[in-house]
A protein has these predicted regions:
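Nucleotidyl polymerases of mobile genetic elements and RNA viruses
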Residues: 1-355
Length: 355
């Protein structure tokens, strides 16, 4: 097991992410089981989850999430208030209870004989921690699934599926109401993508209490723990300020800021797209500044621009139409880098010939 730091200057144990380095045989077995289990996922995983499910895309979650947030952000009148809870799960893989995982697989209809196979790969795991590069002793875990294992994402997906029935049952019993996507549209109550979850409900202390009960039940059964330091809230503008504070105190979380992100993209955009995606240009500029100090050939600069720089905005552009100003600013940075290096090279060559 190797602990990879999440930050440049980690101070606490929570700032590290444990990465399991498995042997070849176990990875082959896990890969075979993963290829088998992913074939049945579209039939047993509800549409609210998109991660690792064949024929489902991350774009599905992003599209629905941004449409919902856009509608909520523009709702400034009315007596009904709504909110979005962006959940953050602490050490999601490491806290999975094996008994819960096994019962989930049996509940969704997987044969008992087949459930035994992935559970054996989980229960027969042992860890040896690398200290200064040397393996030291062995640890036999009693819960959790391995980071980096081919089968682990699918097992965690099944574990997260335990939250969906609780929310759907609350909707049926009118404990939660969800948020309507449009006039006459369907109600959206939750979107799950691995451990990135969005919960939609009315901004009332009553629904907040029911939501807390659901999360407490899920935490107790699955072993998962909500990280309240990173979990955030978003309210539509017409929500009463007193209600906001009451719900914030009940949940013990922070209200969402403009810099909050969902699946790698900003959740709450500015009025201008230029302001919202200004960080794209900043990322490009930082990369170029780092290369400027290095002696890179013309062919090397061309490869870096095409393979690295042009790939930076691709993910965001797949979802949003960038304004012409953003594209022009990025092009200007690249032209300055490209042209500036060429001029410096030409001057140095001319001076060397003159001498």
């Amino acid at each position: 097991m190797y602990s990879s730091p999440k930050k440049n200057e980690p101070k606490y144990i929570t700032d590290f992410c444990p990465i399991s380095l498995g042997n070849i045989v176990s990875r082959i077995i896990s890969k075979v089981l993963a290829n088998r289990i992913k074939c049945i996922l579209p039939n047993v995983i509800f549409d609210s989850q998109s991660a690792f499910v064949p024929n489902r895309s991350i774009i599905d979650n992003i599209t629905v999430a941004y449409e919902m947030l856009h509608r909520m952000r523009n709702r400034r009148k009315g007596k009904t208030w709504h909110m979005v809870v962006k959940l953050d799960i602490s050490k999601a893989y490491d806290r999975v209870e094996w008994e819960f995982l096994q019962r989930i697989m049996l509940k969704i209809g997987i044969l008992t004989q087949w459930v035994h196979l992935p559970m054996e790969t989980v229960r027969t795991t042992s860890y040896s921690i690398l200290i200064n590069g040397e393996p030291t002793g062995f640890i036999t875990p009693s819960r959790g699934i391995k980071q980096g294992d081919p089968l682990s994402p699918y097992l965690f997906l099944l574990c997260a599926e335990g939250l969906s029935p609780l929310i759907r049952k609350a909707i049926v019993n009118h404990h939660l109401k969800g948020v309507v996507s449009c006039n006459g549209g369907v109600k959206i109550s939750h979107l799950l993508f691995a451990n990135d979850s969005l919960l939609f409900c009315e901004a009332t202390t009553r629904e907040c209490k029911h939501l807390l009960d659901i999360l407490a039940l899920y935490e107790g059964a699955s072993g998962q723990a909500i990280n309240r330091h990173k979990t955030t809230l978003f309210f539509n503008p017409n929500t009463n300020q007193g209600v906001k504070l009451a719900i914030q105190n009940m949940l013990g979380v922070q209200i969402m800021t403009n810099c909050e992100r969902y699946l790698g993209l900003p959740m709450v955009g500015e009025k201008s797209k230029v302001s919202t995606f200004r960080e794209i240009q900043e990322w490009v500029t930082k990369r170029v500044i780092g290369w400027k100090e290095k002696h890179i050939s013309k062919a090397g600069r061309e490869v870096l621009i095409k393979t690295v720089i042009q790939a930076i905005p691709t993910y965001s552009m797949s979802m949003f139409k960038f304004s012409k100003k953003i594209c022009d600013d990025i092009d200007l940075v690249l032209l300055q880098y490209w042209g500036g290096r060429l001029k410096m090279k030409e001057k140095s060559i001319e001076s060397s010939h003159a001498s």
